[in-house]
C-alpha cells in the first residue's frame, strides 16, 4: 500500500519508468442518504487538466514498460490476424433503387470504399459477382480513406441515399465523441453541397426524394432530444424542430420505413417506447402518434401494404413479456389489432412452434412477406410469414432451418421493399460467417459469400459445444465453448463437441458437461446487461488464442437477453448481483468439471461487461489469474448519481435510481467495483479505456486502477488518447489493440512463448 507525500502533482512520465504511477489523493466527499464516501481520486474527472493528462500518459508509459517483453508476441498476433483476413475484399452487393451497392477494402487501407454499379433492368435481382478488379460501370460513392486523411480518428455515423441515387447524406466524427457533422454529396458531380450541420447524433437520414434531411441533436447530457428537418440547399439556421422529447428518460431518433412511404419518430427509454409517423407524401406535416405512450409498454413498428391497405406491423409487450405481433390499419392504429401469430393451439403456426417459446425481437416487412427475428431455446432464429389478401392475410410462421443448434441466424441487409429474397447471416463459434439468399416463394437458399479465412487455418481443427452451469439459486446458465480438438480431449463421454467444417452443415449434438484430462488455459467472456445477447460467433483474431491452446467460453449470464425477457429482468436493478454470481458460478463449474483451474483462467468483459469484471474481482479474486476489462463501467454508483453526465437518467431504469431511492443507493454501493476495492490478493488486471469515450468516461478505470494499486494489486491502465467507446477507428490499429490485449492474456496464462504458423 502506497501513498503520495501530499504534493499537488501527479507522477510525471519518464522515458523508462521503474515504478508504477502513484496518483495523488485529494479527498472529495460524496454524501447521499446519510452516507458519506470519501473519493480520493475524483480529481481525475477534469479531462482538460494538464495534471490529469500527465497522469494518464504516465500510466501508458508504465503499461508499455510492463508489457515491453510482449512486443514480439504482439507483432506475431498482429501478423497472424493480418495474414488470415482477406485485406483486399468486397461485400455482397445490395440492390437499392437502380443500383447495386457494395463496399471494397484494399490492402494497406484502413477503411472501406463504398461503390455501385447500375442494375441491368427492373427485373435484375441477382447480385453481380464481384472480384478484385472494378466491374464495368463501377463508380465510387464514398471513400472513407480519403475523408479520413489527416485525422487520427474517423467514424461514419450516418450514411443515407436518395432513392434515385443522386444524393448521399453522410456524418463524420473525427474525435471519437460520437458527435457528427453532416454533409450532403451530389453523386452526379461527386461534389459536396454547401449544406453542413454540426453536432448531430448518429442515424440521420435523407428522405427518398433527396429533398429533406432528418437529424437528431443532443442536450448537455448527450441525450438525443430533438428531431430536425432540413431542406437540402438551405442554411441549417432555417431548420425546423419537428419533435422535442423533454423527458430525460427517453432517447429520440427517426428514420424511414423500408417501403419509403412512412417516416417514423421514435422515443425510447429502457422500459417504454413511443412512435409517431409522418406520411412521405407530406413530410412537412406534424408527426402523428401511433399508440399512446404507456410506461412499461415497448413496441416497434413496420409499415406494409396488405390487400391494398396501408398497415402497421407492431411487436409489443402489452400482454406478454416476450412480445406479441399484431397489425393495425395506418388510418386508425389504435383500432383492435389482428394477431399475426396465434398461440399454441396450432392455428397460425407450423404446428411445432409455440408462441410461448419465442422471444420476439423484430419484424421486417416486405411487399409479399414479413420476416420475424426471435429467440428460441437461447439462440437467434428467423421465421417467415407470407402475406395474402385482406380475407386471409397471414400464412403460418415458418422457421428457417440451419445446420447447427449452437449457431446464430440473423437477418442481413435487405433494403428493397419489393425484393423476393432475403439476406441471412449464419455463424457459430467454429463456423465463419456465411451470407445466404433465401428465396421466399420456393424456400431455396443460395450461398452468396463465406467469410474468408486465409493462411494455414484448418477449420476442422476446432470444436464447439454448449455447457450448462448451475447457479447458486438453481438456474441453469448456458456457456458456449470453442477449442482446438487436437490440443484438448474429453474423457468420460459425458459431452460431445461440434466439429467446425466451415459450412455449418455437420453437427454432433453438444451435451451437458465435460471433463478434461488436465485443466486448460481458458478465457471466459461475459457481459450481462441491457438484454443484449452475446450469441456465439466466429472470430478470426480469436484463432490466435485457440491455436496456442486457450479455450474460449462465453458465459450467457442473466442481465442479457439470451433466454428471453425474464433472463434480462433477473439481472437488472436490484437483481443485478445475479449477473455477477452467475459468472462466478460458471467459472466454478468450469474449474470443478476440469475444464480449467484458477491459475489458468482469465476473465474478460467490456463496458457494462467491465462492471462485471470489476465486481468479480472483488467478489471472487481467487478464481482468476487475470482480468481484462475494456472501457469498464467500474465507478457505477458515482456515475448514476450524476444526472448531468451522459446517459445517466436513462440508465436509472437499468440500474435503479440511487439519487432518489436509498434502497437502490445501498444496493449499488454494495457492488460498485471502485468503492468496494479492499485488501485482497487480486489477480492481474488490465484496464483499457479511451479519453474521448462519451459512454463510459475514462475517469472510471483511471480511478479504479489507482485504488487497486493502492491495495497492492498488479493493475495496468492503457488509455487511447484519441478514440471513443469503440477504440481505434482504423482496422489496422484495431488489430493492434486486439494483439496487445491477447498478448497480455497469453502472458497471464503462461502461453506467451508458444509459436504457431499463421
Predicted regions and their residues:
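Alpha-helix capping and helix-loop boundary segments enriched in small/acidic/polar residues
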Residues: 156, 196-202, 218, 222, ...
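Generic beta-strand/beta-sheet core signal
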Residues: 171, 185, 216, 230, ...
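Cap/lid segment of the alpha/beta-hydrolase catalytic domain
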Residues: 141-159, 171-177, 191-193, 438-444, ...
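Active/binding-pocket-proximal capping segment
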Residues: 281-283, 321, 329-333, 344-345, ...
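Active-site-proximal cap/loop segments of hydrolase catalytic domains
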Residues: 493, 511, 554-758
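Active-site lining segments that contact anionic ligands and/or coordinate catalytic metals
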Residues: 251, 260, 272-275, 296-298, ...
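Beta-propeller folds
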Residues: 1-421, 425-433, 437-442, 493-498, ...
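Conserved structured core elements
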Residues: 135, 159-162, 176-179, 207, ...
Amino acid at each position: 500500500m502506497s501513498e503520495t507525500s501530499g504534493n499537488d502533482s501527479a507522477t510525471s512520465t519518464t522515458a523508462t519508468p521503474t515504478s508504477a504511477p502513484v496518483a495523488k489523493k485529494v479527498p472529495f466527499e460524496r454524501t447521499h442518504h446519510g452516507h458519506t464516501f470519501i473519493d480520493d481520486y475524483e480529481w481525475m474527472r477534469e479531462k482538460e487538466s494538464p495534471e490529469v493528462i500527465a497522469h494518464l500518459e504516465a500510466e501508458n508509459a508504465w503499461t508499455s514498460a510492463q508489457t515491453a517483453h510482449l512486443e514480439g508476441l504482439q507483432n506475431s498476433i498482429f501478423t497472424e490476424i493480418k495474414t488470415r483476413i482477406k485485406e483486399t475484399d468486397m461485400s455482397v452487393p445490395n440492390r437499392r433503387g437502380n443500383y447495386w451497392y457494395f463496399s471494397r477494402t484494399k490492402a494497406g487501407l484502413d477503411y472501406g470504399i463504398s461503390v455501385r454499379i447500375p442494375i441491368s433492368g427492373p427485373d435484375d435481382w441477382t447480385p453481380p459477382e464481384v472480384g478484385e478488379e472494378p466491374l464495368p460501370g463501377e463508380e465510387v460513392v464514398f471513400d472513407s480513406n480519403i475523408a479520413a486523411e489527416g485525422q487520427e480518428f474517423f467514424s461514419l455515423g450516418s450514411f443515407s441515399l436518395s432513392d434515385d441515387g443522386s444524393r448521399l447524406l453522410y456524418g463524420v466524427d473525427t474525435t471519437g465523441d460520437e458527435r457528427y457533422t453532416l454533409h450532403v454529396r451530389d453523386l452526379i458531380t461527386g461534389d459536396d453541397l454547401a449544406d453542413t450541420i454540426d453536432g448531430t447524433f448518429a442515424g440521420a437520414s435523407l428522405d427518398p426524394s433527396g429533398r429533406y434531411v432528418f437529424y437528431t441533436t443532443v442536450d448537455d447530457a448527450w441525450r438525443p432530444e430533438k428531431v430536425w428537418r432540413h431542406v437540402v440547399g438551405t442554411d441549417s439556421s432555417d431548420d425546423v424542430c419537428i419533435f422535442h422529447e423533454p423527458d430525460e428518460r427517453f432517447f429520440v431518433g427517426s428514420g424511414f420505413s423500408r417501403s419509403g412511404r412512412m417516416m417514423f419518430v421514435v422515443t425510447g427509454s429502457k422500459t417504454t417506447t413511443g412512435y409517431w409517423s409522418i406520411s412521405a407524401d407530406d413530410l412537412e406535416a406534424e408527426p402523428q402518434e401511433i399508440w399512446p405512450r404507456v410506461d412499461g409498454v415497448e413496441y416497434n413498428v413496420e409499415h406494409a401494404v396488405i390487400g391494398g391497405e396501408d398497415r402497421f406491423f407492431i411487436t409489443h409487450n402489452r400482454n406478454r413479456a416476450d412480445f406479441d405481433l399484431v397489425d393495425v390499419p395506418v388510418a386508425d392504429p389504435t383500432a383492435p389489432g389482428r394477431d399475426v401469430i396465434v398461440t399454441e393451439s396450432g392455428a397460425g403456426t407450423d404446428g411445432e412452434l409455440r408462441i410461448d417459446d419465442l422471444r420476439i425481437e423484430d419484424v421486417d416487412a416486405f411487399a409479399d412477406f414479413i420476416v420475424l427475428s426471435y429467440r428460441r431455446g437461447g439462440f437467434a432464429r428467423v421465421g417467415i410469414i407470407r402475406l395474402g389478401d385482406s380475407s386471409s392475410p397471414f400464412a403460418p410462421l415458418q422457421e428457417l432451418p440451419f445446420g447447427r443448434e449452437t449457431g446464430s441466424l440473423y437477418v442481413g441487409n435487405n433494403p428493397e421493399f419489393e425484393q423476393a429474397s432475403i439476406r441471412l447471416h449464419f455463424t457459430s463459434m467454429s463456423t465463419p460467417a456465411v451470407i445466404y439468399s433465401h428465396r421466399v416463394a420456393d424456400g431455396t437458399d443460395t450461398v452468396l459469400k463465406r467469410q474468408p479465412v486465409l493462411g494455414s487455418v484448418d477449420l476442422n481443427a476446432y470444436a464447439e459445444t454448449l455447457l450448462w452451469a448451475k447457479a447458486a439459486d438453481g438456474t441453469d446458465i448456458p456457456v458456449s465453448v470453442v477449442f482446438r480438438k487436437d490440443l484438448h480431449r474429453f474423457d468420460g463421454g459425458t459431452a460431445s463437441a461440434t466439429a467446425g467444417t466451415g459450412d455449418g452443415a455437420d453437427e454432433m449434438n453438444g451435451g451437458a458437461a465435460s471433463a478434461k484430462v488436465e485443466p486448460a488455459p481458458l478465457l471466459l467472456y461475459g457481459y450481462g446487461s441491457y438484454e443484449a445477447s452475446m450469441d456465439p460467433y466466429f472470430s478470426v483474431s480469436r484463432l490466435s488464442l485457440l491455436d496456442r491452446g486457450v479455450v474460449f467460453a462465453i458465459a450467457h449470464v442473466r442481465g442479457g437477453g439470451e433466454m428471453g425477457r425474464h433472463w434480462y429482468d433477473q439481472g437488472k436493478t436490484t437483481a443485478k448481483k445475479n449477473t455477477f454470481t452467475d459468472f462466478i458460478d460458471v467459472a466454478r463449474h468450469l474449474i470443478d468439471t476440469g475444464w480449467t483451474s484458477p491459475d489458468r483462467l482469465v476473465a474478460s468483459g467490456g463496458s457494462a461487461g467491465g462492471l462485471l469484471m470489476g465486481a468479480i474481482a472483488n467478489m471472487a479474486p481467487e478464481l482468476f489469474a487475470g482480468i481484462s476489462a475494456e472501457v469498464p463501467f467500474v465507478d457505477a454508483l458515482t456515475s448514476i448519481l450524476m444526472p448531468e453526465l451522459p446517459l445517466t437518467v436513462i440508465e436509472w431504469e437499468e440500474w435503479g435510481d440511487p439519487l432518489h431511492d436509498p434502497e437502490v443507493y445501498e444496493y449499488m454501493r454494495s457492488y460498485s467495483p471502485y468503492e468496494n476495492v479492499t485488501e485482497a490478493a487480486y489477480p492481474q488486471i488490465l484496464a483499457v479505456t479511451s479519453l474521448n469515450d462519451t459512454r463510459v468516461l475514462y475517469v472510471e478505470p483511471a480511478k479504479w486502477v489507482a485504488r487497486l494499486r493502492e491495495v497492492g494489486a498488479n493493475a495496468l491502465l492503457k488509455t487511447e488518447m484519441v478514440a471513443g467507446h469503440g477504440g481505434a477507428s482504423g482496422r489496422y490499429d484495431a488489430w493492434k489493440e486486439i494483439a496487445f490485449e491477447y498478448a497480455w492474456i497469453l502472458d497471464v496464462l503462461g502461453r506467451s512463448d508458444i509459436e504457431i504458423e499463421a
